[in-house]
Amino acid sequence: MGLLTLGTPLPWNETVPYVDYIKEHGIAQFIALYHRLKGREGDQLKWGDEIEYTIVKFDDDAKRVRVSLRAEELLHQLQAGEELNALLGNENCCLWRPEFASYMIEGTPGAPYGGLLACFNVVESNMISRRAEVTRLLENGESIMSISFPALGTPDFTSPPYEPRPDDINSFGCSLFFPDEVIYGGHPRFRNLVRNIRQRRGEKVAINVPIYKDINTPSPYQEDFTKAKDGGQAARAAKSDHIYMDHMGFGMGCCCLQVTFQAVNIDEARWLYDQLTPITPVLLALSAATPVFRSRLADVDSRWDVISASVDDRTAEERGLVPLKNNKFVLEKSRYDTTDCYIYPCSESYNDIPLQYDDKIYKQLIDGGIDDLLAQHIAHMFIRDPLQVFRERIEQDDTKSTEHFETVQSSNWMNMRFKPPPPDSEIGWRVEFRPSEVQLTDFENAAYCCFVVLLTRVMISFRITLILPISALTENMKRAQRRNAVLEQKLLFRKGIATCNSPPCARGAGCTLESDDVVEMTVNEIINGNGNDFPGLIPLMRQYLDSADVDVDSRCTVSQYLSFIQKRASGELQTLAAWMREFISEHPEYKHDSYVGDRIIYDMLKEMDRISKGEISCPKLLGDYCTKTDSRIPMAVRRAEEKLIVSTKKQS
């Protein structure tokens, strides 16, 4: 969702004079916060998920489905309920926040989950409650689905319908496909971001996704944009054999699943940030769920590169298309991409790609007492300009506010995010795991969340290290998006498990990883083991669970989640992307030309909706699992958690 500040957002031309000021004071704010809270210790493990949902409207007579632009109306009702509960002293089961599009809402648990394994047994139940809470407010024909809508940008894809205005200079996006009304209008952040990204870049964003070449797909596949009313931008930008898109909404209008963890202190947060980073491509491949864009089958299964291009505000100079004149750097990546550096001291030698940063900002951080590795990370983020400046919020007290820092931090969308505590808050140092595609059902989303959280427990308990050169991560994220990557791609990964008390980490920050310690592995080998040097992540998790204090129901639920992910990794169960491809290919109206028409999408989403509601089973996608998820943690377990909290506070 990002930072939602109240005020008057400045257009890009009015933002430019404040860019250096915002950066300088954003760094000053981080330095002040760091020194105030760097010694914070003893925070309990807390975590939570964020799921983005799409509201759709089925027209059963016309056999078509559209996105329903009622998010703002629904949010008013949902948030009114939150406020009422707060006044009455009642616990909120879940919280609701706006997202980029007028058809999207973001749901989170009402309070973070705690550190006990029993918390895993309430996750799925909470997700079920979220759907039910929204469903009660929906109109006839509407449904809430945790999917990325496959027909974004096609004619008449919204309810009610609106027309794009590519030749309107007052349009936020000037898109050929994506009307301004589809951007969430309840907060100025989203429309202002669309406008400022376009204006900073100097033209519309250009998204080109390789099209899936079916037997009847034209070769070359080329759309004709010569008559488009956008000054020739589409005709120049669209690539042959690619699906062309031209708006932030094609990326940020896709739904995702994210998990945030609170660490015990800043050192653990930095360490977890590094250790989870190599896992991000694995989860991207495992969660593949987005094979269709603009009603065309793509040759990728993920939204990752689409989002990256959809917010790419780099100028022609920064993209290396013309010599540098007004800008400082040629930037290799969009501001939405993979992380370029590790931040824990032991990981420094694995930062094997050049890191760009402004020397002045880096010096400000070093002079402010920030260590070299963290200073590089922050300075690298601050090569990006702030895209969102509010007129009333320019002057701030840098010792009390972090708004200028968050303005830049929250618009650097990486696969991992290191999150300092908010000012004057009980919240501690956190890391956010960001690559996962949202899944169709609550069971799947709960399984992926619990997998990642349990992995952090294994990492911390066994002190295992999965670090590999950061350049390998960049390559892995490219491979993980490809069609059927979970079965057909190999990812660079550690040959065997090392610990932070054994070589290479024990040798300190100057250690290096021998080249033959990194090998190519399938996702199945990473998850389930290769029978040789690498035991597999889930066997390690089961080993951890065998020695953990966990109640029977929670162990049963977690075991089913792990078994499910093992079968996804092995190919015994399909990813949603694979399931969708199969459904489309077998549909009688599909002409094997890569085009997925209205009726096909209607039938497919109707089937998906019934699966997500539990009205029909889908063994190919989900197997035959049934967890013991419950909305409440047993009282005995809750008391044990309270004792853990008290014990932790005494130790700190």
From Swiss-Prot:
One of its GO terms (biological process) is glutathione biosynthetic process. Keywords: ATP-binding, Glutathione biosynthesis, Ligase, Nucleotide-binding. It holds the Pfam family GCS. One of its GO terms (molecular function) is glutamate-cysteine ligase activity. Pathway: Sulfur metabolism; glutathione biosynthesis; glutathione from L-cysteine and L-glutamate: step 1/2. InterPro entries: GCS, Gln_synth/guanido_kin_cat_dom. One of its GO terms (cellular component) is glutamate-cysteine ligase complex. It is an enzyme of class 6 (ligase). The keyword ATP-binding applies. It catalyses: L-cysteine + L-glutamate + ATP = gamma-L-glutamyl-L-cysteine + ADP + phosphate + H(+). Its EC number is 6.3.2.2. Belongs to the glutamate--cysteine ligase type 3 family. This is Glutamate--cysteine ligase. It comes from Onchocerca volvulus.
